[in-house]
């Protein structure tokens, strides 16, 4: 379906990026660590981020300086030859996009319901800053909501 092995899921705060990754991850418990990267790996894919049942999981649980270990993570990904999923703010930057050339999936949902459901205390300033960053990134595929994103990823990883 796509010729790139790295997928980046982006979207507004509360749009369901972390939920999508939790669904793909399934019940697998453990995680692996490579430098500042934490990830889960199964027979089909690698899911970057720490998913431990917190309100803010996934890439939000990674170090702010995770990008310093990106080259090591890229080496690992290449050695495993699996689809690798990244999501969120930590990876919505020029360095990541240039080095990884990811297939970018943008969730178009405003995220308002998701933020309300989780009792988010993110400031309007933080929410608007991320909305601006998301709007400036060109996507390979846009989806209406997290359910459609999950369906697309499941088709990609088989």
What are these model-predicted stretches?
Residues 135-158:
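NTP-dependent small-molecule kinase module
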Residues 87-88, 99-116:
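Conserved phosphate-donor/acceptor-positioning beta-strand/loop module used by diverse small-molecule
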Residues 37-90:
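Conserved nucleotide-sensing/catalytic segment adjacent to the nucleotide-binding pocket
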Residues 18-30:
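A conserved segment at the C-terminal end of the G1
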Residues 63-75, 120-135, 150-153:
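Well-ordered, non-membrane alpha-helical segments in soluble/globular domains
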Residues 9:
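Hydrophobic anchor at the beta1->P-loop junction of P-loop NTPases
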Residues 1-4:
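Phosphate-binding P-loop
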Residues 14-16:
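Conserved glycine(s) of the Walker
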């Amino acid at each position: 379906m796509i010729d790139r092995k790295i997928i980046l899921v982006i979207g507004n705060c509360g749009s369901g990026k972390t939920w999508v990754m939790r669904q793909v991850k399934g019940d697998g418990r453990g995680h692996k660590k490579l430098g500042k990267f934490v990830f889960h790996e199964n027979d089909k894919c690698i899911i970057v981020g720490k998913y431990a049942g917190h309100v803010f999981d996934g890439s939000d649980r990674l170090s702010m300086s995770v990008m310093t270990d990106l080259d090591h993570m890229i080496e690992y990904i290449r050695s495993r030859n699996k689809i690798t999923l990244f999501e969120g703010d930590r990876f919505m930057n020029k360095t990541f996009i240039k080095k990884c050339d990811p297939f970018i999936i943008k969730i178009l949902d405003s995220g308002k319901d998701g933020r309300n459901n989780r009792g988010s205390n993110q400031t309007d300033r933080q929410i608007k800053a991320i909305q601006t960053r998301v709007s400036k990134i060109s996507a390979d595929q846009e989806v209406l909501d997290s359910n459609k994103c999950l369906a697309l990823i499941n088709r990609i990883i088989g």
